[in-house]
Structure formats: C-alpha cells, structure tokens
Amino acid sequence: MERKYRNSFALEVKALMADGRFAGYASVFDNTDSQQDVMRRGAFAKSLTARRYPVQLLWQHQWQNPIGVIDAIFEDQHGLYVEGKLLLDVAQAREAHALLKAKALRGLSIGYSVKRARRNPDSGARELLEVELWEVSLVTQPANAAAQVTVVKAETDYCDVLMAALRGAERVLLR
C-alpha cells in the first residue's frame, strides 16, 4: 500500500460563520494537481462508509495540532464536501478563523493512502480510484494552484449558501 500524507485540491469554502462553522469542498474531482494526481468520483466511497473513527480536522497536516471537528463529509458530483467547525477555544483554530476571514488562508488539503490507482496513458497523470481518507487540513500552501478559498461569507449569508446547496442537490437528484 502506498502512503500519501498530503494532497491539495480545489477548495471552495461556501460559508464561514462567526462561531467557526464552515462548509466547502476538500477535494474536487477530475482536477490534476501539481503532483499529477487526479481524484476520481467514488474514490472516497469505501473509506467514508467503513470509518470507525471521525475524519480529523488538522492544521497544516500536523497530527498533534487538531483545530476542529468535521460534522459532515460526503461525496457529491463535484467532489468531497465537508461541513466542520473550528474549535475557537484552541489558539490555532482562532488564528485559522481570522486568516480565513481575511482571505489570507486559502487552502484545504487531504491526507490519505492510495488503495487503487491507474496511470492515464495520454496525460501521464495518476488517476486515484480508491483512497483511504485520514484527515482534512487547512493549509497555507496547497499543492494545487486552484486549491484556494473562493468565497467566504458572513453569518447572515449562510441561508443563501444552504439554499444554493439545496438547489444543487435537487439538480443532481432530478438527473
């Protein structure tokens, strides 16, 4: 089994609330990163259903530095969607929250091990078909240039975010 401790994918933080709650994508499918890896739909499915422990929310992939909790995590058509909460009693989580609000911190990254992959003969990229997810981290320097926070909304905008997510889910279900 090949171990891979970190990899960054496009992140879209859809909301950041005053109490530290956030929602967004920790991994986006079909996006080639700087390490020539492409996460494919379904890659997280087995790992998420077989979990015996929660996915950790870490600072910069540092196992000794948890900064919050993941409340919900699942695959949709776009990628790996997460909802979490920074624990603002933790100093590093408060700093991360301030950096996110100021848009100084822009990346999310995942720690995982590769269970099944194949090489794309045309592009040379490694397509990740099955991974075991260990953790989600807030990071300052993601491996993928597209791995950045695109939207940070205030608490009053959270209802708009939820409505947009519901509309997106409705489109997927009606297909």
Question: Which residue ranges define each predicted feature?
Answer:
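Short, charged/polar surface micro-motifs in flexible loops or helix N-caps
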Residues: 31-32, 62-65, 88-90, 116
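A glycine-rich, hydrophobic loop/mini-helix early in the fold
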Residues: 43-86
